[in-house]
């Protein structure tokens, strides 16, 4: 036993392993599962202590792309750019989104767009239905024929239906209507235009470069100074002498002999025929027609001409007094008249210039016998306007053809209406509306007359086509 070596205790290796001089052993490594994907470690760049990194949720919209659907480019807080597709969310016009939803969606990446309605876009379908509904009632009430009723589509060129409705209403409600130098056909034509304009205004239909009434409000300025008249250019008209020869049997010749015996005489012309020679010392013409002969106009003329300047100014004063009597509280009607610009042959929507005048011819007519009436015996103010100023303005076809005279090469019609009857047509249409439509009378806006080169007198007609179904012309 004495020669056997001494055995060391078994706890010594353990104490040696756990001594503070050596670090503790690492735990055994576990094997990774094959189905587990470990993302690659991204080393963030070292930042300066003075730089505070932004949150990844912070973003800034750089710009929007106008594609369909729309996109927007945003920049994240970490500097990366992202293209985001905008999703269309329709929000009703009357529904206001709550503030809570806006706060909740402000931090999300989903963009919200509102559907904004363009106020300039007119709902044509609903306007057409509204106008057709009213016209169906009027056509049924005033006995429009079934063929015309079926063909009516509420189009601008279908003014004949409005004219027939007005004619039937006049026969039933205003029988025996008195007119002054106005034909019944022209009066109902103008009433039909005013009615069509009111129906279109009621329905909400608007036209571009076209006025349904064919009229304008003209600030003539012919009553400001005594003896001074102004043409459609707005310039002062020139006074010159005029000698006219007309046939004895014509309408103009007989009227001249009856109304102006001191200025007319019957002579024989160079062909030996008896004619009525009329000499006017107070004729007025446009400044562009000073060098032109009788019944001749330059290519820059407005076509306005008066054989007697004094009679024309009396007619303008009559219309001014007539409007003052009918509308005593008017604010903007002084020295303005309602002028029909387009007769039947000019009332075309293509607006192609015709040969001759491009506006209705304006002629002053004398009211024979009006000067014999006493103002003390008449109490009606509108009638007193004609007694004090016994002349009226008459609007005729742009290129009229008189009886027993040679026809002109341009288009013509029998359009003829006086200035007071133009106002009467507008007044009767307003009465018609109040009697037949429950809705209030819409506000009719008649444009103000402004001179344009399109209204110049045309001595040469533009070439026009007549249509052809063939593909090749030759």
From Swiss-Prot:
It is found in: Host nucleus. Residues 244-278 are annotated as: Flexible loop. Plays a role in the elongation phase of viral strand displacement replication by unwinding the template in an ATP-independent fashion, employing its capacity to form multimers. Also enhances the rate of initiation. Released from template upon second strand synthesis. Assembles in complex with viral pTP, viral pol, host NFIA and host POU2F1/OCT1 on viral origin of replication. Covers the whole ssDNA genome during synthesis. The complementary strand synthesis induces its relese from DNA template. May inhibit cellular transcription mediated by the interaction between host SRCAP and CBP. This is DNA-binding protein. The keyword Transport does not apply. The modification Phosphotyrosine is found at residue 142. Pfam families: Viral_DNA_bi, Viral_DNA_Zn_bi. GO terms for cellular component: host cell nucleus; viral capsid. Its main location: host cell. The C-terminal arm bridges DBP molecules together, thereby creating a chain. Keywords: DNA replication, DNA-binding, Early protein, Host nucleus, Host-virus interaction, Metal-binding, Phosphoprotein, Viral DNA replication, Zinc. Belongs to the adenoviridae E2A DNA-binding protein family.
């Amino acid at each position: 036993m004495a020669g056997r070596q001494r055995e060391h205790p078994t706890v010594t290796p353990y104490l040696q392993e756990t001594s503070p001089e050596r670090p503790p052993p690492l735990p055994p490594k576990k094997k990774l599962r094959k189905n587990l994907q470990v993302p690659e470690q991204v080393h963030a760049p070292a930042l300066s202590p003075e730089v505070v990194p932004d949150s990844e949720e912070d973003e800034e919209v750089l710009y929007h792309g106008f594609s369909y659907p729309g996109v927007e480019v945003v920049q994240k807080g970490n500097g990366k750019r992202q293209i985001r597709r905008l999703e269309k969310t329709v929000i009703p016009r009357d529904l206001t989104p709550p503030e809570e939803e806006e706060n909740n969606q402000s931090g999300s990446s989903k963009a919200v767009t509102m559907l904004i309605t363009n106020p300039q876009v007119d709902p044509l379908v609903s306007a057409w239905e509204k106008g057709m509904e009213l016209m169906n009632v009027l056509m049924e009430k005033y006995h429009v024929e079934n063929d015309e009723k079926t063909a009516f589509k509420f189009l601008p060129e279908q003014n004949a239906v409005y004219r027939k409705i007005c004619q039937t209403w006049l026969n039933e409600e205003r029988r025996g209507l008195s007119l002054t130098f106005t034909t019944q056909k022209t009066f109902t034509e103008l009433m039909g235009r005013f009615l069509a304009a009111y129906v279109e205004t009621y329905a909400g239909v608007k036209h571009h470069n076209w006025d349904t009434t064919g009229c304008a409000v003209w600030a003539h300025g012919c009553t400001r100074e005594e003896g001074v008249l102004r043409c459609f250019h707005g310039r002062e008209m020139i006074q010159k002498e005029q000698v006219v020869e007309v046939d004895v049997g014509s309408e103009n010749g007989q009227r001249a002999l009856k109304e102006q015996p001191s200025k007319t005489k019957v002579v024989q012309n160079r062909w030996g025929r008896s004619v009525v020679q009329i000499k006017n010392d107070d004729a007025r013409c446009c400044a562009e027609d000073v060098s032109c002969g009788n019944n001749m106009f330059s290519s820059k003329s407005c076509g306005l001409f008066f054989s007697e300047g004094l009679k024309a100014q009396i007619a303008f004063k009559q219309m001014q007094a007539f409007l003052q009597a009918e509308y005593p509280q008017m604010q903007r009607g002084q020295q303005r008249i309602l002028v029909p610009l387009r007769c039947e042959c000019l009332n075309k929507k293509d607006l192609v210039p015709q040969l001759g005048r491009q506006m209705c011819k304006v002629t002053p007519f004398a009211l024979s016998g009006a000067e014999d009436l006493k103002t003390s015996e008449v109490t009606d103010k509108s009638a007193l306007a004609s007694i004090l100023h016994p002349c009226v303005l008459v609007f005729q076809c742009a290129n009229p053809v008189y009886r027993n005279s040679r026809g002109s090469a341009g288009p013509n019609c029998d359009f003829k209406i006086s200035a007071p009857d133009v106002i009467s047509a507008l007044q009767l249409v307003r009465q018609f509306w109040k009697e037949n439509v429950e809705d209030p009378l819409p506000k009719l806006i008649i444009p103000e007359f402004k001179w344009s080169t399109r209204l110049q007198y045309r001595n040469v007609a533009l070439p026009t086509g007549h249509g052809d179904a063939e593909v090749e012309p030759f």
